[in-house]
Amino acid sequence: IAQFEDEYKADAVFIDMGYGTGIYSIGKQLGRKWRLIEFGGKSNDPVYLNMRAYMWGQMKEWLREGGSIPPNDQALYDDIVGPESIIDKNGHIQLESKKDMKDRGLPSPNKGDALALTFAARVVKKSETGNRIVANTSYNPF
């Protein structure tokens, strides 16, 4: 992951807490500022039941606004259209469970989850030096 982060000059790296804690620990030892994301954790938006539903919702909006996936990646396409959205009894948007998908004969949407993970939080672009870009002027209201 560190090699890809450097090669593609990633502005952020999000790691699935479910399977990535070991990788995260190694990255931390290497001085990386990666973030663990708990798919079942609290959503950034109260409309969504959990973080997984939130990330998939953000991905859906991105696609609706013109984001695209490689046209020849049928597996990713199938993953994205596989899980259904459900409204729970409290009015939260919830993504269909992987167990329910399996009961319908669908595989776990691993590639879809990986793409959705990129929507876990807003990312501030780094400058060429690797630092976060901030305003280059001081603000003085007086």
Show where each model-derived region lies:
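Mg2+-dependent endonuclease catalytic cores in nucleic-acid-processing enzymes, primarily RNase H-like
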Residues: 1-92, 136-142
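Acidic two-metal-ion nuclease catalytic site recognized across multiple nuclease folds
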Residues: 77, 81-142
